[in-house]
């Protein structure tokens, strides 16, 4: 046993020594460089090594990084300690950074009403345009601008607390590009713009991608700077075996890794201390294993303590740059400047951002305001700087507008009411007028239907719109038998004023056409012309699994304006209010208040309030009510209160319980209003998939003999 331990220690010592140059001689007062390789999530190992360097007080004179090495190295060069970078890594949702989802809460009012598509394909000059990557990198800008705000006035990277450079690849020439000056955030984004994951980054007249395509392990650039001792953190792994090369992604990664391996071997001769953490089983996308990867880097770094302790020590503990008076936590913006703007002018930008000038702002506020601008879907990417003149400072936006005007979109959905539907959509921007949006949905499936929406968005100045829809559906009884079959067509003209993309107020005139029949007999036709007013709001953070925000849809209308007797006209008022309250990070309480009243007599049956079923489509005066079949209950006046307790786990999984109760009455009276006629309990299991919601619901009505009902929902509602 004793001999075995000695053998293991000897082998370990040999392996460590093999990572240190045999002829390494540490000169007097050597300059120390740090070479940080690229590798996506594997780059978290850099942070563990930095923690070791910090614990030993090692003085680093220059840092070179590629891709994730550029991000970590840039933070360290800007004065962050290893522990501080560790906290940043652990607190950051890297999947969200890659997928780059637009904030629903900041989306325009029109976009919130059409967020139901799985795929959107731009059309330019009549041709389909494929996306250049999964992400534009917009969320990376927000994060990096916030992290590097303390050095945002430094455009010469040699002036950072630790001199720094990062490597990118010129996409046009294929040549390596070393960034040592310019916009630090933009340079780091260029170095880490992995093809297909992140859009190429435009700097000057060139576009750049991940530096790993040319030099993934930048040790030679440090030697070229006169660095004596280069400490490298090597993330290189063996190429995949034949049995693992069984799909297109694995094959493409292998092709890329071949060149990375070849260049990394060349860089070894410029690396004096080569620290290679154990990353077996890890990949560039192993973000769920970030703690393990970081710890492996720390463990590997500790093995080199003896040689590292021989290096010079720094004279101070903190490298963080003192607070800049202009780029501090709160700073003043006197004016706005745009670069790259061809379609949307300064007034449009200021209005959508909600930016008043002059004003005091924080980086967080600027990020949120730019996010509002991005959420309009009129921009592909927005970068920014705060530039100080002698007497004032201004916010400069570098915008890349989305000049596509026409789109084909697709969706897929299933529910127990409208069954299976394939959604085909044509959308257009700036059609006939500058601030217009057109959306035409055609649903092919068990219940064909269409929706047409055209609106001129003038912000708070009233804009004109038209809306048209058509569908058919079956009404059920307590035994789930069809008791009526309706066809419904609606055409509307309206005006609408939108306030801060959160509230819409307006009014219009709608024409409804109904055809109803049962077993091809007793066919009824009716037409109604109804003037109406409305107020709407939607600040929910998620359409399918909201945990915060509110939803309001209130409407008042006169039913059948052309009815000859004015005093017998019927007025209806209804409101749908949903309040989502986050209780903890996992739990949320959702309250839905729905009410509708009818003033007048002889209400046409088509305008009765009808409850039952699990659905979210806009259908006359129908409202979902778990535990009952679609439109099973009908009345002239209704109060419905629904309570949900939602639990979120494993990021995209949800479990919720529901208790709902309703009052239905044909007359308006206090005595009728306080009675609870119907109630139900329900439970829902849900998953937020890349293709939309997946939900399974079981609901059971109380106080009657009706059986429980299972419901399945797949995909976004339409």
Which residue stretches match the model-derived regions?
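Gram-negative/organellar outer-membrane beta-barrel architecture
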Residues: 364, 369, 383-544, 614-623, ...
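Short glycine-rich beta-strand segments
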Residues: 469-473, 510-514, 555-561, 596-598, ...
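C-terminal outer-membrane beta-barrel translocator/porin domains of Gram-negative envelope proteins
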Residues: 410-412, 531-650
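Patatin-like phospholipase
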Residues: 19-66, 74-371, 375-387, 393, ...
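Bacterial Sec-dependent N-terminal signal peptides
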Residues: 1-25
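C-terminal hydrophobic structural anchor segments
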Residues: 646-678
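Outer-membrane beta-barrel and related beta-rich outer-membrane complex signature
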Residues: 245, 476-478, 517-521, 566, ...
């Amino acid at each position: 046993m004793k001999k075995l331990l000695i053998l293991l220690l000897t082998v370990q010592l040999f392996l460590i020594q093999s990572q240190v140059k045999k002829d390494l001689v540490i000169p007097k007062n050597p300059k120390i460089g740090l070479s940080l390789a690229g590798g996506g999530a594997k780059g978290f190992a850099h942070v563990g090594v930095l923690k070791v360097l910090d614990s030993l007080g090692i003085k680093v004179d220059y840092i070179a990084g590629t891709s994730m090495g550029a991000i970590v190295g840039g933070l360290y060069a800007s004065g962050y300690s290893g522990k501080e970078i560790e906290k940043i890594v652990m607190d950051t949702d890297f999947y969200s950074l890659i997928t780059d989802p637009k904030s629903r809460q900041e989306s325009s009012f029109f976009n919130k009403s059409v967020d139901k598509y799985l795929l959107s394909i731009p059309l330019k000059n009549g041709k389909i345009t494929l996306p250049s990557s999964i992400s534009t990198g917009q969320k990376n800008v927000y994060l990096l601008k916030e992290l590097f705000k303390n050095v945002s006035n430094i455009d010469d990277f040699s002036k950072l607390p630790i001199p720094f450079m990062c490597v990118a690849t010129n996409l046009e020439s294929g040549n390596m590009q070393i960034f040592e000056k310019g916009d630090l955030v933009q340079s780091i984004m260029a170095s880490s713009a992995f093809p297909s994951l992140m859009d190429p980054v435009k700097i000057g007249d060139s576009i750049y991608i991940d530096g790993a395509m040319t030099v993934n392990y930048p040790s030679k650039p440090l030697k070229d700077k006169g660095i004596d001792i280069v400490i490298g953190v090597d993330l290189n792994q063996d190429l995949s075996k034949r049995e693992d090369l069984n799909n297109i992604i694995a094959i493409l990664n292998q092709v890329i890794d071949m060149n990375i391996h070849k260049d990394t071997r060349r860089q070894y001769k410029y690396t004096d201390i080569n620290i290679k953490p154990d990353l077996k089983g890890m990949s560039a996308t192993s973000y769920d294993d970030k703690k393990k990867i970081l710890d492996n880097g720390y463990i590997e770094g500790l093995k080199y303590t003896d040689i590292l302790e021989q290096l010079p020590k720094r004279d101070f503990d903190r490298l963080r740059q003192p607070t800049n008076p202009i780029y501090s936590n709160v700073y003043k913006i006197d004016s706005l400047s745009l670069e790259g703007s061809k379609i949307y002018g300064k007034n449009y930008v200021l209005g959508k951002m909600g930016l008043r000038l002059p004003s005091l702002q924080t980086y967080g506020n600027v990020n949120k305001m730019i996010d509002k601008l991005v959420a309009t879907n009129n921009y592909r990417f927005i970068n920014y700087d705060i530039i100080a003149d002698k007497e004032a400072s201004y916010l400069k936006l570098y915008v890349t507008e989305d000049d596509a005007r026409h789109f084909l979109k697709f969706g897929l959905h299933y529910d127990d009411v409208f069954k299976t539907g394939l959604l085909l959509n044509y959308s257009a921007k700036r059609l006939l007028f500058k601030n217009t949006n057109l959306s035409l949905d055609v649903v092919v499936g068990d219940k064909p239907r269409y929706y047409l929406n055209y609106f001129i968005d003038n912000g708070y100045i009233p804009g004109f719109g038209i809306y048209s829809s058509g569908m058919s559906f079956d009404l059920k009884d307590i035994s789930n038998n069809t008791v009526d079959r309706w066809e419904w067509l609606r055409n509307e003209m309206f005006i609408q004023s939108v306030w801060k993309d959160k509230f819409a107020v307006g009014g219009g005139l709608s024409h409804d056409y109904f055809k109803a029949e049962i077993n091809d007999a007793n066919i009824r036709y009716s037409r109604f012309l109804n003037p109406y007013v409305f107020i709407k709001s939607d600040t929910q953070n998620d359409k399918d699994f909201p945990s915060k925000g509110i939803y309001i849809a209130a409407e008042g209308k006169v039913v059948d304006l052309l009815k000859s007797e004015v005093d017998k006209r019927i007025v209806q008022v209804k409101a749908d209010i949903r309040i989502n309250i986050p209780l903890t990070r996992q739990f949320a309480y959702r309250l839905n208040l729905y009410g509708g009243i009818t003033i007048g007599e002889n209400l046409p049956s088509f305008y009765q309030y009808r409850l039952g079923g699990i659905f979210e489509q806009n259908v006359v005066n129908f409202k979902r009510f778990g535990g009952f079949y679609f439109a099973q209950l009908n009345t002239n006046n209704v109060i419905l209160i629904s309570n949900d307790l939602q639990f979120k786990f494993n990021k995209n999984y949800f479990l919720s319980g529901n208790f709902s109760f309703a009052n239905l009455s044909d007359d308006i009276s206090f005595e009728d209003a306080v009675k609870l006629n119907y109630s139900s309990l329900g439970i829902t299991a849900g998953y937020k998939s890349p293709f939309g919601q997946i939900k399974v619901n079981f609901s059971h009505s109380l106080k009657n003999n009706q059986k429980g009902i299972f419901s399945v929902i797949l995909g976004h509602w339409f």
